[in-house]
Amino acid sequence: MKLLVVFAMCVPAASAGVVELSADSMSPSNQDLEDKLYNSILTGDYDSAVRKSLEYESQGQGSIVQNVVNNLIIDKRRNTMEYCYKLWVGNGQDIVKKYFPLSFRLIMAGNYVKLIYRNYNLALKLGSTTNPSNERIAYGDGVDKHTDLVSWKFITLWENNRVYFKAHNTKYNQYLKMSTSTCNCNARDRVVYGGNSADSTREQWFFQPAKYENDVLFFIYNRQFNDALELGTIVNASGDRKAVGHDGEVAGLPDIYSWFITPF
């Protein structure tokens, strides 16, 4: 009888162990949740990504969002910008402020910023002289990093599940655009100007974030030509370098072709 009693007492304990194991196995790990969020962003399902992010944050699991954002930037995913934009306009501004690098918030909020080319440490500006169309050539300034010559802000445009940006220069009230003509220094690279209007895709840009030596950087591409914004190798008497559109692959070289976006 003692054996029977002991056996009867052991059965509930074993059953409880089975139930506990089953519950644990049904609970998704943080890695699973990160993978699902990451994949939602990569496939362009931004509404789902925003819902997941808001849910994780409300449950005290914001580290999931933080890790996904870090991985997106390290992997140089353009979709990072769309995800950030949809959070910004979809009740997720606090998530952007908390888990994205500062530069993302500056871009989305339309704050005044400086665009500094990493390779030469020069800030983007528009020249003082104009052509017959009242356009100004864009340069990297050899000295200035503090006046409104190098002050810009971004205006967002959402189209076909993508976010694009118009870059507005504070000093001259003009928009950064890429010319249809090429630079005389390189027959493949296009000249970059500031112009009064912003009614075509030549005045629209998209960003690809990257990380290099712990710095958050951006490749800046023109929507119409898909050329990356860069500064040329030729230096004028003022120490300025002309801005052009690079006709070629740049994503593998963030140390050369990327930009810092910093507060003005």
From Swiss-Prot:
The keyword Signal applies. It is found in: Secreted. The keyword Protease does not apply. GO terms for cellular component: extracellular region. Keywords: Lipoprotein, Secreted, Signal. Residues 1-16 form the signal peptide. It comes from the Eukaryota. Belongs to the 30 kDa lipoprotein family. This lipoprotein belongs to the group of structurally related '30 kDa proteins' that comprise major protein components of the fifth (and last) instar larvae and of pupae. This is Low molecular mass lipoprotein PBMHP-12.
